[in-house]
Design a protein with these regions (language model features):
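Asp-based, Mg2+/Mn2+-dependent phosphohydrolase catalytic module
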Residues: 1-7, 16, 38-39, 98, ...
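N-terminal helical cap/lid subdomain that shapes the substrate entry/recognition surface
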Residues: 2-107, 120-122
Length: 230
């Protein structure tokens, strides 16, 4: 039986995009610290790398605000907007998502989202609303709001709570990363489906690659893939 399908966000619901993280922080530094751009950008990049290393190695979360604070950068909404505008190309929802989620919901399956992210919920919800899919989720967890990141079992438990499901054996997780998503979900007791299109840098690999229960090339395949498990 499948009560819920929970999705990763970046590289799963949004197609993978490769971008230069150094440029990401230069954009913010130019907006918020024009008198010390190079210094601020380097400090932001170092703080972000520390946050992601903590996520990979200790499965503890961080936030965009903490990155800015560690870099001694004061950024307001206008500065945030410049940063977000730079990254907008990587936030667009795959066109398969809306019909696929609708099919799952019509079958009585609850739909959730669990994203390892430094960014606040409001940013993610703005992007999902822009693409007309925000209201299709029964619950969403962004690790910027909880202590843990994938692959920690508590992150998956939080996602189950968000969609109102108690038994991990009745949940399926869909993601693009073999460590965070596939290993993590299976370690938490879920089935896991892999979307194998992301060019995840080797520096972001974890200690274990999960063996997915299924692999799909397109999100539109998800309803058919989980049908035998129902």
């Amino acid at each position: 039986m499948v009560d819920a399908v929970i999705f990763d966000w970046g590289g799963t619901l949004t197609p993978w995009k490769t971008f230069d993280p150094a440029e990401e922080w230069l954009v913010l530094a130019r907006a918020a610290a024009p008198d010390r751009v190079e210094e601020a950008a380097a400090a932001l990049a170092a703080a972000a790398e520390d946050a992601w290393a903590r996520s990979r190695n200790e499965h503890r979360s961080g936030t965009f605000a903490e990155v800015c604070a560690a870099a001694e950068l004061v950024a307001d909404e206008a500065h945030h907007r410049a940063y977000r505008d730079h990254l907008e190309f990587a936030t667009w929802t795959d066109p398969d998502v809306e019909p696929m989620l609708t099919t799952l919901r019509e079958a009585g399956i609850r739909v959730g989202l669990l994203s390892n992210t430094l960014w606040p919920r409001e940013w993610h919800e703005e992007w999902l609303a822009r693409d007309g899919v925000l209201d299709l989720f029964d619950g969403a967890v962004y690790t910027s709001e909880i202590p843990w990141t994938k692959p920690h079992p508590e992150a998956f438990a939080a996602a189950m709570d968000a969609v109102g499901v108690a038994d991990p054996a009745r949940c399926v997780f869909v993601g693009d990363r073999l460590f965070d998503d596939i290993y993590g979900a299976q370690n938490a007791g879920m089935r896991a489906v892999h979307i194998p299109h992301s060019a995840v840098p080797e520096s972001q690999f974890g200690h274990t690659d999960g063996e997915p229960d299924a692999v799909v090339q397109h999100l539109a395949e998800i309803p058919d893939v989980i049908q035998p498990w129902r």
